[in-house]
Amino acid sequence: MNQIEIQELTTHLSQALDQNYDVVNMDAVLCVICALEGTTITKEQLEATRLAKYINQLRRRTKNEHLARRAKSLLKKWREMVGIQQTATENLAHPSQISSSQPALDLVKSPITSFITEPIAPSQQIVSDLHSNIDSAEPPLSGEHTLLHPNFSNLVNSIKDSDRHENIAITTLHTHKDRRHSHSIRSCHVASPQPIVIDHSVNSVINLTDDSTVKINEASVVIDIASDSDENDNNGSLNPKKLNSIVPAPLPIPSTPSSRQRKLKKEKRSKEREGQVATNTRFGAKASDGFQQAALTTDSEIFSLSNSSMSSIVSGDATSSYSQNKSRLNSNELTFTGRFKAVDHLFRSTESGKHKIDEYSAYDSNASCSRLSPSTVDEVKKAEHLFDAQLTNTTANQIPMSAVSIGYESNTRHEYLESDSPSQIPKRRGRKKGSKGVDALIAKESSSLSQQIFFGGSTVKKVKTTKELFNEIQSRKLSVSMQSSASNLSNSSTNRDLPSHTTFPRQTSSCSDTSMNSPHILETLSGSAIFASKIDDLGNTDSDTVTSDPSHDSNKSQEIKECTSLDSNSNSIQSLPLANNRENLIPTNVNDITTQLMHLIHSLNSPLSEIEIERVYQEKIIPCTCIVIEGVQGTLGESNNSTLDEQSYNAKISLNSKDNLSCHNQDNYSTSQRSVNGEVIDTQPKLVKSIFDLDFDDNDDPLYFIMDEIQKPIARADELKNNKSDTKNINFGASAQNASLNIIHFNDDAQQDNSNQERGKNETQNAIPAFTVHEDPDCLARQRFYIQTNKVTSFHINALHNYYIPNINGNWDSVESFTSFQSEHTIMDTMESYTVTNGADVVPKYGLLTSDRIRKDLSSLKSIKPYRVKNFTSLISPFLGVAKCLPTCRRARRRFKNFVNSSTANDKISNNFESLENMKTSFKNCNPLNVKIDGTTSAIYSHNENHVPMQVNTNVEQLPPSQSFSSNAISYNLLKLADDKVCHDGISDKSSNTGCQGNSPYSSSSSSSYSGRKEDQHIITKNLQNKNIQLNSRKSDMKRRKRIYLENDSKKKKHYRKRIKTAVNRTFSNLHRNLYSIDSENGMKNDYKNEYGNSNNEEYAIVQRPAGDGENCSNHIVLTIKKTPSKINSPANSMTAFSPPSTSDGANLQKSILDLRLEDTNISQSITEIPQKKDLSKTDRIVHQSRSSAYRRIFRKPDKSQTKFIDLDLKHLFHLKANSPCISANAKLHNKLFFPHELSRDNTSGIRERLINYSSSSSSSYDDDSEVENTSFLKKANVNKFSASNNRNLKTETETCAATAISEFKFESDEDSILTSLGDSDIDIQDEIQVINDKVDYCNDFQNNKMLESFNSIFVDSLRTNTKNASDNMGSSAHITSLESLKPENADAITRYCNNNNLGVNLSNELSNISAKPLKSFDSTMKLPSLGIEHCTGIKTSSDMASTNIAEKKLTRIQQFKEWHQVLQLRSYNNEPLIVLPYVLLE
């Protein structure tokens, strides 16, 4: 019970008692005690309610022995529950007990004795009595029986008693009960057997006194705890003959049940005593009824032993006694189930239909199981009436046990009713010695038995949760059913098969341990046939709980079910189709559980589908019964009021007629209308507002007051005017009737005045439709609305977010309309057709109705998934989102300023650039997010800073500002992240190679590396650290690449400084290389951090707007994600970008991406043949260093054994820079999507700007990461080249290439000059550099500049191999030459880059490396595999690049892109571009 119920019981009890605790209302007291006996109670509840005090006082004050006994049993139970074990034992040997034992002897004499094939002891013939009832059997025929077989004889006796008490104190020899049983019908007063006290430890049934060592071979005693009391009652009425007939087969008694039996016996004895006394009183008065209730509750309690009853029965005592009993009785001999049933009770079950309706049924285990709700008084009374009927019938019907026990057993209410039992059975409040409160546990009284079993038996102080109960029930069902199934099947099953009820004991209520309390379980456990039979009764007697099986339901139980709903909590399912036979039940116990579970599962409804939900919803749609009344205010308030009143009245009538709407609103409305009196507008009743009505209430709406305030002054003015100019007043105003005229303001003031006045009147009087909603309080639609709106469940949310709803939540009209990446063209088309300019394009603004498609899946805006991607192991967690811009840009700008502050830097920058101001301007233009960085160096650093912002001054030790910076290059560097590290690590070499290559983007990277030399070194150090970290994690090949890279880094560091110095000394092309190297180093760094095989460095490219946009064009911060061309050709590879007007290549670049793709396709075809390294002859050396670098990169690519990276940006985002045609000759496939000339263009200041850093040139230049040394060398060369390019006219001497003079050239002429300037030595150097670059690129390809392998890199293994070989042949002088040649070309490219505000990625360098000649030679040497459409973008031919000759133009650039990440450039809210990348690695 819960606290409230306990409190109520306490209240009732207190009311039933007077101040002296004398019983005032015996019925109420008995009801309360029955309820308490049938329920569990917690210590806290007792403490809170002080219920124990009332019970104790009642026990002390009452003169009713039965009531006192029951109260005492309750207190015992509670003590045990509370943990206060009372060692005091009841004096079981009372004359009454002796007398009851005598009836037990009579029982033994009765055929029951015959029923017991073997007496447990010589005197164990009492077992036959057990069949009648344990209580009946309990009184041994002789004292020796009680002594010899205290368990069994006592069990029998106690069964009788228990029948009365529902609690079988089997543990104690109910000799006194036997004596009491002597009072029972068959009670033959044998010499009162000595009361045998059976320890609780010993199973009461099996506990035989030391005298009874013989096991009962007689028919196994099935002890049905639940039913024995009733059965005892019933059996008491029954003749021993029945017991004999019923018992024929020994019932298997599991040893564990025996312990329960003991406890039950004890409880039965004590409760029987109490019950007998109570029944004696009951027979004379309601006390008997109360006792019957108690007895009834006893059965129910036994089943309601949810917590302790069965557990107590099965407690250690039970188990220990079980072992003892086991020695005494075979498990087959004793069977405990639910309640102890005598075997005869099995037969009686048929009779039980007649009599089992008695009190016992009222006390069904189920009924008592729901201890929380003990059987109601009516139920108890009903049970009592049933019991009385049974008493009348029991004498004939019940087993001899009843005859034996009725005289004694309180359980045998029949005896009490007969009133011989009370006389025969002395009141015994004390426990027998050794009873250990088992009496309390198994008090025969239904309440005391169940409660004691619940509380005392197991001494369970804790109320078990439903889950615990269910688990225990199942486990017990399994164990008990499995254990007892064999024995029960063998013995008891046959006996119980007789009664269909017993076959399937009903499960007890959930309150009780179903397994233990369930009739079948108890029956299975019960060792006495009586118990078994009682189980049948239990089934019958169980209240209408689901647990009770109809098969078991006896008539009594069925009748009681009406009264007792307590068992409704029972876990068992009555409907389970179990055979009536206990055999069926036992073998199907496991199956029963499964069946029950299946029933439960099937009872659960499967979730409704959307269609079903919709259907249900449609079915549930209810028309709104609310009424909207349009109250048209008449011209006069009165008329309005009357109209409104009529309307409201009519509405009321209609509503009332419908009985749907309450009219009080209308009444109020009408009343308010009546009160309005022409002021209806102001005083109109408050309309019922719709939840959608956001307007003020009429009374609260300030509009009326505002209107009044406005109108009053107007009216006053009108009056004044009217007074002043009455002559001017016109009829128009006078016509108050004409609202329109009133409204119209005439030029005449008087007319206006009149109109205003009349207007105010008319406003109050004019018929303004007023819609009044009369809500029907019973409107189902409204209720549903409130319910649904107030109860938004996950279903609604999921429906909104996950379900496809056309035109809702951005869902497109059809699911099929969802666009995914379908083809190159479709990508560009979708990009163009569907533009994401701001968040509203993805997420509609609040309150904005968006009928257009809103992409919920922007995957189409992303590049194709790379075919092969290395496991991404990043030291830094990838940041998905907009590339970081401002902090980096600011840092870069500060660094640039710092660098620019140095006069040398300024001079160099001025030398390298037309003007530092131009650089700064372009750089500022290049600043992402319009972040103004005052120097290209800062941009370069920022380019390096993409991963780690780098200060040019810090990073660039000696790089001349011109070398280290171009505004575009700076801007490129500003956002280039991945490339920076690579630039430092691998790109420096690459850039040096590029420097040799001249136009190769390495030159820019080298310049970047120069600019970031210190930082490059720092980054390199970080990169090395990162690489070291990643080397550990990388595969052996990656480790090898790392080692190469580390070596390259170490070399790079050295060479970087040297090259940077040289670059500072004047190699602007080296600036490009430095840029590339920085980028590549950053990329390398990122590669180490981000381990994607071929992914090149991600870089934020500041995309300069086309020259047409002007210097002022805000830079686009683009994180260029490169994929190896082998990976995926994405239409983004060739992006519609403005080809820099500076070169014809730029025009080509201007082609749309599709054009570029076509062009690439054509290029792939034309490029099919690419001059190999052999082409990289001195002739090729003559080719610009960029060419040789490109070639070398190609060569390195084979070394790297990975596709080269192609820097990709959205074509439309990038203005391709045109590289000098020199690239065509030596050109190896450009690692980048665009050639330098494509990326560069002349800015407004005339400086060639890099339109975009669509790729981390460093990574592309590094595409071969094979050699970090090469990278470092390239970086030096790039530094030189970058410095040369910065200086344009200055010769760049790298320490490596110091001997070689690099031709001076201007940015504009860099590529051309490189083409012309490159000498054989340059070519050799380029080859060498290219080899280095190839190695670097190899590393980069694996490391991929921390970018995804899929990042673009041109892959021509054969070309790269040949190139690498040629580059290997090429000496440092060749590198120098390449650097020289690259310088001009790189300078141009860098200039373009800087002008483009790109991150100083000298694509032109690399592109220039792919000079037309080298390309031509490559073309002749090798054919690029013709690329399919997927690779069309991968191949680009820049005839402009190969301007030197037509062949070179054809071969000018071969770019093979197999995959790329499409970079989405969004226009930021300030109209500045934001680049959204699939992966943006931020440090």
Curated annotation (Swiss-Prot):
PROSITE patterns: TFIIS_N. Coiled coil: none annotated. It is found in: Nucleus. Keywords: Activator, Nucleus, Phosphoprotein, Transcription, Transcription regulation. Signal peptide: none annotated. Residues 550-564 have a biased composition (Basic and acidic residues). The modification Phosphothreonine is found at residues 541, 1179. The keyword Nucleus applies. SMART domains: TFS2N. Residues 227-278, 414-438, 480-518, 541-575, 989-1041 are annotated as: Disordered. Residues 480-495, 1000-1011 have a biased composition (Low complexity). Residues 426-435 have a biased composition (Basic residues). Residues 8-85 form the TFIIS N-terminal domain. It holds the Pfam family Med26. One of its GO terms (biological process) is regulation of transcription by RNA polymerase II. Belongs to the Mediator complex subunit 26 family. PANTHER family: CRSP70 (PTHR15201), MEDIATOR OF RNA POLYMERASE II TRANSCRIPTION SUBUNIT 26 (PTHR15201:SF1). This is Mediator of RNA polymerase II transcription subunit 26. It comes from Drosophila melanogaster.
